[in-house]
Amino acid sequence: ENNYRRTDLLIETIKQLNTEKYGFIIIGAGKNKPDFSLYNNVYDFGAIYDTNIKRELFYIADLYFQPGWVGLSIVEAMAYGKPICTFIRSEETKQCVEYSYIENNTNGLIFTNIDDCITRISQLTNDEIKQLGANAKKKVAQLLTPQNMVANALSIL
């Protein structure tokens, strides 16, 4: 059974980060979804389709963390000004095309392993998070609007 989203890395991150300082908001459903009820700092909302609720959850989040198989959801997170955190593309950690939108240390963080992840998240300052988020929002505004995507596609033809 495939676990492209690397929920094992998510669970390991939840376990290793300070539970008093870090909370996790989980949105989504699926057969590989772990049981998050074991963790008192994890808030599992399941599948959400109401954009108002999603907007509120993005508003209170500091980072968007998806260990593997990042897809279109990162564009939404970037539009909300959230830095993207994921693991480097490898044989074990597959990534979608949207992975290329993440610029390490500019609009997000790309981790090499779990120790790198824990260290870098733990050392992030609020100012760094704000700057990464502002850069993420700027990238979406400049490059990833539907108009620009159409223009880029047409330029190839």
Which residues does each predicted region cover?
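Glycosyltransferase donor-sugar binding loop
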Residues: 1-2, 22-36
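A conserved mid-protein helix/loop that constitutes part of the nucleotide-sugar donor-binding site
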Residues: 2-16, 34, 72
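A charged, aromatic-enriched C-terminal amphipathic alpha-helix characteristic of glycosyltransferases
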Residues: 115-116, 126-157
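Acidic donor-binding loop of glycosyltransferase active sites
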Residues: 56-72, 82-83, 90
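A structural motif in glycosyltransferase catalytic domains
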Residues: 6-13, 24, 117, 153
